[in-house]
Amino acid sequence: ENTVQIQSSGIQSEAYFTIKESNVGHIFGILRNQLYSNKPLAIIREYCTNAFDAHVDAGIPERPIEVSFPTHFKKSLTIRDFGKGLSENEVFTVFNSYGESTKRGTNDQVGMLGLGSKSAFCYVNDFKIVSHHDGVKSVYLAYIDESNKGKISLLSREATDETGLAIDIVIKSEDLYSFREVASQFLYEFNPQPIVLNDDNVVNNLSKQDQTSYIVRNDKYAVVNDSRKSNTVRMGNVNYDFDISD
C-alpha cells in the first residue's frame, strides 16, 4: 500500500475520510451495479475461482469443483466446492462486508479485495449460500433489503457428512445462453476442469481437445499463446491478456 508522509507542522485541523451510515446503501448500490461490465462472466469467474481456492486451502487442489446449470425443475446456477466449508461467523463476516477477504495472507489463492463473494448481487437481489462445515449443513439467504444494504439470514440447519460450500443463484431463462457461453469460454482451460451438470452444450465444449500452447508454464503461473485468443498470463485459473507484439 502506498502512503503519503507529510510534515505535521503548520496543520490547523484535519479529518479522516469516512462513509456516513445514511450513505452506505448508496455505496453498496454503486458496487453492485457498476463494478462489473460483464455480469455473467463476473459470477462464473468469481465463484469458480473461490471454489478452486477452497480446494487449495483444504489440500485437495486436484479435485474438480462442480457447476450445475438450470433445468426446467431447478432454475438456479450452483457452484459447489468440497473444501472445509464456512462457520456461521465466517459466512457473516465474508459475505456481509465489502472489502473483507480471507486471502490477503497467501499468494496461493486468487483475489484479496473482498468483492468476489458478493458478485451475485450484480445480477440478482438474493442468492443462497449452503455451507457444509463441522457436521452441519447450513442454508443462508443473502438478500438486498429495503435499506439497500443487504442482509444474510440463516434459513435451516441439519446434520451432514459432507464438507464444502455451494452458491445458488437463480438465472433468468433469457440469460441462460449468455451464462453457457461464458462458462464454455472461461472454464475451457480451468485446471482441473469442473464437473458440469445439466448442460450438454457446456460439457461438449469443455471436452474438446485443448489447443493451448504454453510460452512459459510452472506451478504458479503460465504464459499462454492460444489460437483462440490473444497472449495471456494465467494465474490461478484466471487469464490476463497482454500484448507482446513489440
Predicted regions mapped to residue ranges:
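Glycine-rich G1-box
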Residues: 84-85
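Conserved RecA-like P-loop NTPase helicase motor core
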Residues: 100-101
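GHKL/Bergerat-fold ATPase module
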Residues: 206-246
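Bergerat-fold GHKL ATPase/HATPase_c domain
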Residues: 1-64, 68-71, 89-96
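Conserved beta-strand core positions
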Residues: 63-65, 77, 127
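Acidic ATP/Mg2+-coordinating residue in the GHKL
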Residues: 81
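Short beta-strand element(s) in the Bergerat
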Residues: 74-77, 165
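GHKL-type ATPase core
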Residues: 106-212
